[in-house]
Amino acid sequence: MARLAAFDMDGTLLMPDHHLGRETIATLSRLRERDITLTFATGRHVLEMRHILGTLSLDAYLITGNGTRIHSLEGDVLHRQDLDPQVADTVMHHAWDTRASMHVFNDNGWFTGQEIPALLQAHVYSGFRYQVIDIKSIPAHQVTKICFCGDHDDLIRLRIQLNEALEERAHLCFSAVDCLEVLPLGCNKGSALAVLSNHLGLSLADCMAFGDAMNDREMLGSVGRGLIMGNAMPQLIAALPHLSVIGHCGNQAVSHFLTHWLDNPHLPYSPE
């Protein structure tokens, strides 16, 4: 039986309205009763995740910023990784040929250059929001990650530009169809989970994980049991064809799967 369960948030544990369902919360409590360690592995900021965690009355480790930070149950930093300052400086100051909006993250919060109210819809559960600022004024040595939000085809073209400019100095991935992330080289949820599992005296084979986007690829592919959401990006399913696909986040599929796993571990699972 797995000893640690790692969960992506958006498109996985959260429903389409960006809330946690009652069944999901109850199932997470059941996992803790079985002494299974919980880990939320997300692109969201730790400041937001601490608020969400505080509403659940659950102990969980936090992998945030797509692996740039790991926090203990007590809130202590176990691991940190920032963007190379030269990479951050290039991304923030270059005039990219794109209509996508740029968003910069550091330990103090989420920063962008203009009001984009539509982006706040994903944060209604926590009330977390961006701060509008001149992005070029942000110190490059304090940046954890940078992301661009916009049309997918536009982001694909932007990724080509970023790859040419940054070469092998950063890790680029889609955390959603409409979100392209620039992360520290070698930084992803999978590498962060490896650090955390080692800290806990576990192996990745002792872990199970759930996800729906390309920023979950390394995590899902490295654990003992990786589960892909039915609403996942097609690219993720294609990249990990050997992994099982469960149901849709709107049906609280993670809870559905885990309830079966807890109650009938030796029987085959069907998402129906």
Swiss-Prot record:
Cofactor(s) of this protein? Mg(2+)
Q: What is its EC number?
A: 3.6.1.-
- Molecular-function annotations in GO: 4-amino-5-hydroxymethyl-2-methylpyrimidine diphosphatase activity; magnesium ion binding; phosphatase activity
Q: Which UniProt keywords apply?
A: Hydrolase, Magnesium, Metal-binding
Catalyzes what?
4-amino-2-methyl-5-(diphosphooxymethyl)pyrimidine + H2O = 4-amino-2-methyl-5-(phosphooxymethyl)pyrimidine + phosphate + H(+)
Q: Where does Mg(2+) bind?
A: D8, D10, D212
Pfam families in the record: Hydrolase_3 (PF08282)
Q: Which residues form a coiled coil?
A: none
Q: Can you tell me which residues form the catalytic site? A: D8
Function, as annotated, reads: Catalyzes the hydrolysis of 4-amino-2-methyl-5-hydroxymethylpyrimidine pyrophosphate (HMP-PP) to 4-amino-2-methyl-5-hydroxymethylpyrimidine phosphate (HMP-P).
Family membership: Belongs to the HAD-like hydrolase superfamily. Cof family.
Under HAMAP family, the record lists:
HMP_PP_phosphat
Q: What is this protein called?
A: HMP-PP phosphatase
